[in-house]
Design a protein with these regions (language model features):
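Rhodanese-like catalytic fold shared by cysteine-dependent sulfurtransferases
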Residues: 1-32, 39-74, 83-126
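Short, surface-exposed ligand- or partner-binding patches at beta-edge/loop junctions that are enriched
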Residues: 78
Length: 126
């Protein structure tokens, strides 16, 4: 029986991953930067320009949103440490998307490299 880690390892064999240093250029060239973490994780801090489509909704969102129909979209994905992003990249490739990349190490690697993260600011009350 396969574990989640087995599935992630298998997914990583068939996808394109970029490290944190390559990620900046990949993000600039991307049509979509997608954070596949859950909404609460996204709201605690995310990469600038990222949209949140949680892993559990990804295939449904791409199947039902006409703006996401083009299989030529240049897509960069990330999650906490790259497991969910790898599974997401594999799914999108299986759906026919041609240009999908995952950031190796996810937002944890991004933050470890001291790259900027957008965090929400709440209004101050006196």
């Amino acid at each position: 029986m396969k574990t989640a880690h087995d599935l992630v390892a298998a997914a990583k064999q068939g996808i394109s991953e970029v490290d944190v240093e390559q990620a900046e250029a990949a993000i600039q060239a991307a049509d979509l930067l997608i954070d596949v973490r859950e909404a609460d994780e996204y709201h605690s801090g995310h990469l600038s320009g990222a949209i949140n489509i949680p892993r559990g909704l990804l295939e449904f969102k791409f199947s039902n949103d006409e703006a996401l129909n083009s299989r030529d979209l240049n897509i960069v994905l990330y999650c906490k440490n790259s497991g969910r992003a790898a599974l997401s990249a594999k799914s999108l490739a299986e759906m026919g998307y041609l240009h999908v990349q995952s950031i190796t190490g996810g937002i944890e690697a991004w933050q470890a490299a001291n790259k900027p993260v957008v965090t929400p600011s709440l209004p101050e009350f006196d």
